[in-house]
């Protein structure tokens, strides 16, 4: 999957670990959305 920036990772992608994964059709079972304002396409989810 494509990595994405969770709220807990910091304010920007520079120098921060991207702990989320983009899921186009929503988070799979056992995962949760980790952003307050999600990406334009899909959801940024983490385990």
From Swiss-Prot:
Disulfide bonds join 4-44, 6-34, 27-45. It comes from Bunodosoma cangicum (Sea anemone). Pfam families: Toxin_4. Keywords: Disulfide bond, Ion channel impairing toxin, Nematocyst, Neurotoxin, Secreted, Toxin, Voltage-gated sodium channel impairing toxin. It is found in: Secreted; Nematocyst. The keyword rRNA-binding does not apply. GO terms for cellular component: extracellular region; nematocyst. GO terms for molecular function: sodium channel regulator activity; toxin activity. This is Delta-actitoxin-Bcg1d. Gene3D superfamilies: Anthopleurin-A. Binds to the sodium channels Nav1.1/SCN1A (EC(50)=453 nM), Nav1.5/SCN5A (EC(50)=440 nM) and Nav1.6/SCN8A (EC(50)=1740 nM), thereby delaying their inactivation. Also inhibits Nav1.2/SCN2A, Nav1.3/SCN3A, and Nav1.4/SCN4A, but to a lesser extent. Toxin effect on Nav1.1 and Nav1.6 (and on Nav1.5, but in a lesser extent) consists in an incomplete inactivation. InterPro entries: Anenome_toxin, Myo_ane_neurotoxin_sf. The record marks 16 as: Important for toxin activity on Nav channels. Negative results: does not show activity on Nav1.7/SCN9A. One of its GO terms (biological process) is regulation of signal transduction. Belongs to the sea anemone sodium channel inhibitory toxin family. Type I subfamily.
């Amino acid at each position: 999957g494509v990595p994405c920036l969770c709220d807990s990772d910091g304010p920007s992608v520079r120098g921060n670990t991207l702990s989320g994964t983009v899921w186009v059709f929503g988070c799979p079972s056992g995962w949760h959305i980790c952003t307050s304002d999600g990406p334009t396409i899909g959801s940024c989810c983490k385990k």
